[in-house]
């Protein structure tokens, strides 16, 4: 692309004039380092704030930049996690004791699913490389694809069935699907008895609360017949992967919505098997690079809030 930068540019003139001149990497790094040292000497190490996004890469985002903040001595390091994935991280930890999904980006795993359900996840536009790979596997196997999204997204245009849910109705819909599956005894009882702790109490709770398709229809703006059909497809699929992402993570009840979808995957036996999972695409690896104690900076002030 003609717009791609291939070397550092330094502003000349006033800010906003949009005038820049190319400089070498050595000059750029030297000038930045000198300004950082000046700020640290004048205002303290806490004057430096670091913000890192996911596009820097997991190892850089959660590893090197976090490590640099500890070596520099600033507590003011933040990523996109609080508004991108904190809800699902907590949900994964509460449900399975680990903050990441339990399946892999492989054809033998994700390509084995008979049903792919994209729940608030527009992968075709937001993660085209991932989607292209997974969708190629899906088409190769001849698997079905359902998209649950208020908008007719690019991902939805590829689906066998698009369910235009009302924004915020995700947890109600998932609870109703679970209610139907339990009521019709469509759950994988053998899997539940072997691997799902507390599933009988969960079943009793769901049925007692009355989270029926009729109850959820008014919250999700989806017909009872559609809710029942969705439950049937998930329960009868020989391997179903439910993909969640920003549509779940950045809305109300994020943590509990993620947990309910994890429960849905669990009671249908879609956990820890090829082609079966709840896979939140905001997932990241837990990385904690260790730093020798004598190299850690002394952080004197608390993190800014």
Spans of model-derived segments:
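N-terminal export/assembly segments and adjacent metallocofactor-ligating motifs
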Residues: 1-184, 223
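Short glycine/proline- and acidic residue-enriched helix-loop micro-motifs
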Residues: 12-20, 201, 212-217
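Conserved active-site and cofactor/substrate-binding residues in soluble primary-metabolism enzymes
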Residues: 23, 27, 63, 168, ...
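Flexible, glycine/charged-enriched surface loops at secondary-structure junctions
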Residues: 43-47, 187-192, 241, 272-279
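Conserved short loop/turn motifs at secondary-structure junctions
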Residues: 49-57, 218-222, 245-252, 284
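Internal, active-site/partner-interface "lid" segment
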Residues: 185-213
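Non-catalytic, charge-rich alpha-helical accessory subdomains
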Residues: 217, 222-242
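A glycine-rich, hydrophobic/aromatic-adjacent loop/helix-cap motif
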Residues: 234-305
């Amino acid at each position: 692309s003609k717009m791609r930068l291939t070397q550092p540019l330094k502003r000349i003139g006033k800010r906003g004039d949009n005038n820049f001149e190319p400089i070498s990497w050595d000059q750029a790094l030297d000038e930045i380092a000198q300004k950082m040292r000046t700020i640290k000497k004048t205002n303290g190490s806490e004057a430096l704030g670091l913000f890192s996004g996911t596009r820097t890469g997991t190892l850089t985002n959660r590893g090197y930049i976090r490590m640099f903040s500890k070596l520099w001595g600033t507590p003011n390091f933040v990523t996109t996690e609080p508004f991108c994935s904190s809800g699902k991280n907590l949900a994964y930890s509460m449900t399975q004791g680990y903050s990441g999904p339990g399946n892999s980006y492989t054809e033998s795993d994700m390509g084995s699913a008979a049903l792919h359900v994209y729940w608030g996840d527009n992968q075709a536009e937001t993660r085209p490389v991932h989607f292209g790979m997974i969708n190629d596997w899906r088409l190769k196997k001849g698997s079905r694809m359902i998209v649950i999204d208020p908008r007719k997204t690019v991902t939805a245009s590829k689906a066998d069935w698009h369910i235009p849910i009302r924004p915020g109705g995700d947890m109600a819909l998932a609870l109703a699907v679970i209610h139907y599956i339990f009521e019709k005894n469509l759950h994988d009882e053998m899997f539940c008895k072997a691997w799902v702790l507390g599933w009988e109490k969960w079943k009793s709770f769901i049925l007692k609360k009355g989270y029926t398709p009729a109850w959820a229809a008014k919250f999700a703006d989806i017909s009872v017949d559609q809710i029942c059909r969705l439950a049937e497809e998930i329960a009868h699929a020989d391997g179903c992967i439910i993909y969640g992402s920003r549509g779940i993570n950045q809305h109300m009840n994020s943590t509990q919505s993620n947990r309910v979808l994890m429960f849905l995957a669990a009671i249908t036996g879609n956990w820890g098997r090829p082609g079966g999972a709840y896979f939140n695409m905001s997932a990241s690896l837990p990385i904690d690079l260790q730093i020798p104690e004598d190299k850690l900076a002394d952080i004197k002030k608390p993190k800014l809030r």
